[in-house]
């Protein structure tokens, strides 16, 4: 009988399988990042993978809407797979308005986007992130950036850089240049400032109606500068915003330092729900974009009708794993129990049970392999100890224990072996 064709045996395009050594690496990173979030007082949350399409599409922007996995269920309801966790969490909070504020939540979960798969980018992927809901203070912005920095450091991204901006600064700048009507096209162009040639970035603006001289001026202004200089830059554009930024930078300096933080006017983020401070994180030898976030003070009002300040960030887990070189974690089996004789099976089960109670992993040979094949098998899967139990050992009440790392073998009474394990 013929099996499935090759394309059906592979994952669906944009998806991936996680083999044990890959999944243990994922779990290791999950544990590290969860500890960081919980050390800041954040609590883990989960939401359904499936949401009403209207909830997802309400403030995402057309580009993201086009990437939603959309379908109708058997009742005819328009549904979609979540593309991030910020929108579902905003919905949850809108349905639970009596929750004490500020809310500090974090997540480590799967999200879905139907975009073009690339190296290190999938249509089904994991995100780790946090949401801080209920505070408009610049201390809240500083806390979230601080938590992002600590998360990157904990993951091993010691050379990370976080670039920050504020959409309100860009909006005020455009107002002063008489370009407020072109905000959307300017945002689209700025987002490509370091991803595309100058002519392409300027061309996006001019084709959208921005005068060529203004487009060139905006391109020149959309550069990087130290955060301390950014305070003066923002103050010249708007005094009130300058005051906010001065406090924000002061709190950042106290919390995380400014060495790895930089102001970049081209950082605007692709989601339409951002309203204030925005930022992106880069890590690894090639400075991969591994995450980002910002403030979304209007999003919850769309769902609850109540104005609620909020901000957060999300890290693309697979991208971060690539940036820090975390691709595989081996988890050896502790004990493999090989029995020569059927009469030893009950004793082998007893030994395995006692080892498991002590927190070890233990496997009893199923009877399909001879000792030579079993030995080759345990080496291939990664095993610390091979325990041998035959008729002679059973009569003497002992086991042979072979340490596969030290290449040593000892014989021990069964009870002594279990006590000393």
Swiss-Prot record:
GO terms for molecular function: ATP binding; histidine-tRNA ligase activity. Its main location: cytoplasm. GO terms for biological process: histidyl-tRNA aminoacylation; L-histidine biosynthetic process. It is found in: Cytoplasm. Transmembrane segments: none annotated. HAMAP family: His_tRNA_synth, HisZ. This is Histidine--tRNA ligase. The lineage of its organism: Archaea, Thermoproteota, Thermoprotei, Thermoproteales, Thermoproteaceae. The gene is hisS.
């Amino acid at each position: 009988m013929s099996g499935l064709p090759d394309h059906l045996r592979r994952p669906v395009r944009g998806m991936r399988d996680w083999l044990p050594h890959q999944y243990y690496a994922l779990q290791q990173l999950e544990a590290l990042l969860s500890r960081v979030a919980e050390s800041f007082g954040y609590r883990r949350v989960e939401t359904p993978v499936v949401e009403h399409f209207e909830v997802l599409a309400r403030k995402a922007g057309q580009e993201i809407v086009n990437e939603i996995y959309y379908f109708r269920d058997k009742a005819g309801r328009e549904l979609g797979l979540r593309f991030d966790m910020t929108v579902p969490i905003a919905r949850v909070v809108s349905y639970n308005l009596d929750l004490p504020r500020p809310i500090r939540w974090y997540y480590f979960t799967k999200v879905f986007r139907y975009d073009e798969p690339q190296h290190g980018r999938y249509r089904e992927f994991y995100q780790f992130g946090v949401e801080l809901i209920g505070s408009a203070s610049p201390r809240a912005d500083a806390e979230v950036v601080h938590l992002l920095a600590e998360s990157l450091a904990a993951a091993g991204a010691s050379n990370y850089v976080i670039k920050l901006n504020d959409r309100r600064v860009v909006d005020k700048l455009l107002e002063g240049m008489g370009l407020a009507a072109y905000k959307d096209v300017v945002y689209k162009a700025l987002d490509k400032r370091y991803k595309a040639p100058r002519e392409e970035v300027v061309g996006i603006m001019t084709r959208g109606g921005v005068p060529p001289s203004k487009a060139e001026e905006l391109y020149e202004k959309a550069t990087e500068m130290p955060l301390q200089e950014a305070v003066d830059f923002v103050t010249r554009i708007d005094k009130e915003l300058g005051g906010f930024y001065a406090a924000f930078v002061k709190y950042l300096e106290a919390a995380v330092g400014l060495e790895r933080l930089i102001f970049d006017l081209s950082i605007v983020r692709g989601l339409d729900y951002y309203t204030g401070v925005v930022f992106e994180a880069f890590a690894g030898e090639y400075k991969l974009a591994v995450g980002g976030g910002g403030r979304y003070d209007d999003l919850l009002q769309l769902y609850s009708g109540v104005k609620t300040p909020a901000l957060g960030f999300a890290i693309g887990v697979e991208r971060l794993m690539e940036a820090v070189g975390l691709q595989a974690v081996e988890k050896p089996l502790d004990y493999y129990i090989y029995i020569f004789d059927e009469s030893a099976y009950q004793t082998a089960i007893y030994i395995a049970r006692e080892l498991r109670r002590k927190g070890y992993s233990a496997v009893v040979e199923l009877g399909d392999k001879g000792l030579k094949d079993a030995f080759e098998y345990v080496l291939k899967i990664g095993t610390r100890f091979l325990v041998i139990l035959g008729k002679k050992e059973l009569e003497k009440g002992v086991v042979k224990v072979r340490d596969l790392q030290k290449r040593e073998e000892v014989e021990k009474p069964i009870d002594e072996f279990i006590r000393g394990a």
